[in-house]
Amino acid sequence: MTMTVRQKLEHQPISDSAVTEHHYTPYLRDYDVFVEVPAALPNGKGSYIESRYRYRFTHCVTAEVTTAVSADIWRKSWDNVLIDYETWQNAGEPNGYVWGVGYSDAYPGLRYIEGSKVAQDWSRRLEKEMHEIMIETNGHNIRLVFHDVEIQKVAQGDPETRELKPLVDENNMGRS
């Protein structure tokens, strides 16, 4: 039995994970969202990245990214010292949003927009079923209108070394 787009997304770990990157693929049709999923270490003392996933939203007609950071925090976070984590630490950890952490917390995470008027309009225009989602993080909100989603585990974490081992050729991920 084939899963619907909504079912595929409901069974995946986007919420309470880290969005590490998102962008259109090199061929500009599809939109990729990379997510790292944390897990507790087996001894319960600390955590590691259990896995990394690529969510490829195919035939993406809308990709809208807006800030989730308030204007007040933006004003406090203007300095370039905040775009590099080590530079921020060396500067005495000044107040502001530390852009340099390199990820956004996916909370509340992904929400499927049931009955989306925008997706319905695109479905009618393209004569293909389209869907709309919103991914909310502490840094950005990502709204996508797309046809399907392909979910691939691209790296597996090791709790002993806390390193991620690639499962696919990362140089070819834009085309696979």
Show where each model-derived region lies.
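Surface-exposed, interaction-prone regions used to assemble/regulate multi-protein complexes
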Residues: 1-176
